């Protein structure tokens, strides 16, 4: 019996994920595709004050792609991503310390916010960028719950100071609208569709 071919025909392509995030690595691996991980040098993840909050993640993912695109070989496909949490007009990145993490969670408590992941997919001759937005609602979190989460999970590597797949997501998130995986760190359904477009060009 012949082995079924994967719907994404990447046999002549080399997929590269430019991210040190274990969550993004696991999500991309769930697409059943082979890829290599490239860790980018330190990238300036600031963005212009004039840029709307909803565009920050895509802007930063583009900066990451620019730092690596010149190193690509002809058959390489590079994926870069950045995730931001947006509350109103305020962008919440990764907290600088535990106190900052507690402050962010108090801001998100009892509110609906947006998780926006900007993705750039680049080859030697093309680049396409997009953003995926998910609305997330938190219940009103107690100080005890916030303190327990920060002290136990140390979410300093997560935008908005939380991981939806962790304890705080299980007890605190009341609803989401949009892609769950986008909140975890990578909108894999949209990435799959974009890769199909590139392969079929």
Residue ranges and their predicted role:
Residues 2-6, 11-15, 49-201:
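Anionic-ligand binding patches
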Residues 2-4, 22, 39-41:
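Short glycine/proline-centered loop/turn elements that form peptide/ligand docking sites
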Residues 5-33:
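N-terminal beta1-alpha1 ligand-phosphate binding loop
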Residues 23, 43, 127:
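Surface-exposed, flexible loop/turn segments at secondary-structure boundaries
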Residues 33, 39, 140-142:
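General structural signal for secondary-structure boundaries
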Residues 35-36, 78:
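A short coil-to-beta-strand element that immediately follows conserved catalytic motifs
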Residues 36-46:
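A short beta-strand-loop structural module common to alpha/beta enzyme folds
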């Amino acid at each position: 019996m012949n082995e079924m071919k994967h719907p994404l025909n990447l046999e002549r392509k080399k997929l590269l994920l430019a991210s040190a995030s274990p969550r993004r690595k696991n999500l991309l691996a769930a697409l059943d595709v082979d890829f290599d991980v490239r860790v980018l040098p330190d990238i300036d993840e600031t963005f212009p004050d004039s840029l709307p909050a909803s565009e920050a993640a895509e802007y930063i993912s583009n900066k990451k792609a620019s730092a690596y695109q010149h190193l690509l070989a002809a058959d390489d496909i590079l994926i870069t991503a950045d995730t931001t949490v947006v509350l109103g007009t305020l962008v919440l990145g990764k907290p600088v310390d535990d106190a900052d993490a507690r402050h962010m969670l108090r801001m998100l408590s009892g509110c609906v916010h947006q998780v926006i992941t900007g993705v750039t997919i680049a080859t030697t001759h093309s680049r396409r960028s997009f953003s995926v937005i998910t609305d997330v609602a938190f219940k009103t979190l107690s100080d005890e719950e916030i303190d327990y989460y920060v002290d136990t999970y140390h979410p300093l590597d997560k935008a908005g100071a939380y991981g939806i797949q962790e304890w705080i997501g299980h007890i605190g998130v009341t609803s989401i609208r949009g892609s769950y995986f986008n909140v975890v760190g990578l909108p894999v359904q949209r990435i799959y569709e974009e890769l199909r477009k590139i392969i079929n060009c």
